[in-house]
Structures are given as structure tokens and as C-alpha cells.
């Protein structure tokens, strides 16, 4: 396990260009299936204390409800290793936790299995509404390809912890 960040949070990875096969998930879009992995700092983090400044979309806020519980259950059923996805109890994420922020509750679970997960990850969801990609990483047009075909378009994500105005940028 990595050390607990000394600051409020630390962005670790971003899954961008999350184009989904329409045959597997009719109606699914890139903006519904992108994800950001981060680790919380030394404080307990409430869902209401987090805000993302997406480079290419508006922030819709985080949601934890029956829909997110169902999604978490479906995704947990794909795990064949000893990992576990959990929603934050009472909307509170413990210090030093690995967190995965999914950009929509309209995600395509069939296209996002967690088969080989071997760790515990707190799973949180942005409220639905954004369908275009959050990062606008490449100009691929309508082309789905294993490598980007368009020109690079650098963007930055800022994830903020409101109580202390602390943030991380990736």
C-alpha cells in the first residue's frame, strides 16, 4: 500500500477516452464511463467536501443512493479475486483510502468489469447528465481505435477538498 498523502488528496490515475462498444452497451457514451483514481489524505473526507473541475464538462456533484448501491453490487459480482468495491459508509471516506470516482451513474457495467481486483476501493459516482468526454484528450472524431488518431489536446483535472481549499491537479 502507498503511504497516506500528507495533503488532502492525491490523484493517481485517470481513465480517459472511455469509448464503449455500442453493441455491448447501447446508448452508452464516453462521458458516462470515465474514471479517476485518487487517494485521500490524513482526514476523513465527506462526499459533500469533494468537487472536480473537469476540463471539458460541468461538475454535477456526487450521489450515493439506491442506483449507486446497485451499480456497486453488480461490479462486485464481476470480481473473481479477493478485492472489494465499497461505497463510503454514511458518505464518509476514511483517511488514506483508495477511491475510484466514476463520472456517471449511467455507466455501462458490462464494459467495466473488475475481475482481477485484489484491494478494497471506495467507489463514488458523479450524478448523471454529462455524455461527452470529461477530458477531450484527442480529436478522434467518431473513430474507436486502440491508439489515438487525432491531434493531442492537453487538459487538466483539478480535484478539490473544500474544507481546506486544498486540491490536486493532473
Where are these regions (language model features)?
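Short, Lys/Arg- and Gly-enriched loop/turn segments at beta-strand edges
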Residues: 104-130
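Intrinsically disordered, low-complexity Pro/Gly/Ser/Thr-rich segments with frequent PxxP/GP/PP motifs
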Residues: 69-109
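Conserved beta-structured recognition patch
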Residues: 47-57, 121-170
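Sequence contexts marking disulfide-bonded cysteines in secreted/extracellular proteins
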Residues: 7-9, 18-20, 24-26, 81-83, ...
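Short aromatic-acidic-glycine turn motif
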Residues: 56-68
Amino acid at each position: 500500500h502507498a503511504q497516506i498523502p500528507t495533503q488532502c488528496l492525491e490523484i493517481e490515475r485517470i481513465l480517459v477516452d472511455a469509448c464503449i462498444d455500442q453493441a455491448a452497451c447501447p446508448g452508452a457514451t464516453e462521458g458516462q464511463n470515465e474514471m479517476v483514481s485518487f487517494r485521500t489524505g490524513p482526514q476523513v473526507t465527506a462526499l459533500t467536501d469533494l468537487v472536480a473541475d473537469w476540463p471539458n464538462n460541468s461538475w454535477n456533484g456526487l450521489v450515493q443512493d439506491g442506483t449507486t448501491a446497485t451499480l456497486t453490487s453488480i461490479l462486485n459480482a464481476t470480481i473473481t479475486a479477493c478485492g472489494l468495491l465499497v461505497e463510503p459508509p454514511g458518505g464518509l471516506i476514511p483517511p488514506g483510502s483508495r477511491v475510484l470516482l466514476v463520472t456517471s451513474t449511467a455507466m455501462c457495467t458490462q464494459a467495466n468489469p473488475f475481475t482481477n481486483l485484489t484491494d478494497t476501493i471506495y467507489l463514488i459516482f458523479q450524478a448523471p447528465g454529462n455524455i461527452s468526454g470529461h477530458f477531450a484528450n484527442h480529436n478522434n472524431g467518431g473513430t474507436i481505435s486502440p491508439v489515438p488518431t487525432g491531434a493531442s489536446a492537453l487538459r487538466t483535472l483539478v480535484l478539490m477538498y473544500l474544507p481546506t481549499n486544498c486540491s490536486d491537479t493532473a
